[in-house]
UniProtKB/Swiss-Prot annotation:
The keyword rRNA-binding applies. Gene3D superfamilies: 30s Ribosomal Protein S19, Chain A. PROSITE patterns: RIBOSOMAL_S19 (PS00323). Keywords: Ribonucleoprotein, Ribosomal protein, RNA-binding, rRNA-binding. InterPro entries: Ribosomal_uS19 (IPR002222), Ribosomal_uS19_bac-type (IPR005732), Ribosomal_uS19_CS (IPR020934), Ribosomal_uS19_SF (IPR023575). GO terms for molecular function: rRNA binding; structural constituent of ribosome. One of its GO terms (cellular component) is small ribosomal subunit. Belongs to the universal ribosomal protein uS19 family. One of its GO terms (biological process) is translation. It comes from Corynebacterium glutamicum (strain ATCC 13032 / DSM 20300 / JCM 1318 / BCRC 11384 / CCUG 27702 / LMG 3730 / NBRC 12168 / NCIMB 10025 / NRRL B-2784 / 534). Pfam families: Ribosomal_S19. Protein S19 forms a complex with S13 that binds strongly to the 16S ribosomal RNA. This is Small ribosomal subunit protein uS19.
Amino acid sequence: MPRSLKKGPFVDEHLLNKVDAQNEKGTKQVIKTWSRRSTILPDFIGHTFAVHDGRKHVPVFVDDAMVGHKLGEFAPTKTFKGHVKDDKKGRR
C-alpha cells in the first residue's frame, strides 16, 4: 500500500538540509548518505548522491525521471555473479 497523500513523501531531515544548503550556495558537491529510504524530490535534480549499498557508496546522479522514486532503487545491494555451470563430467 502506498504512503498517504496527506502525509507527503518521506525524506530524512538531514538530507533535505544538505540539499537546501547546496542550493543556496549554488554548489553541486557529492552528498554522502546512508538514507536509502528517502524519496527523491524535485529539489534534488542535478545533485549527485553517494548512496550506501552495504559495502560502499554508489554515486547516483538525479535527473527528472527519478522524482518520486527512492534513493535506494538506484544503488543495488546484490551483485549477480552468474549461474554455476553444471559439471557432470567431474562426477564420473
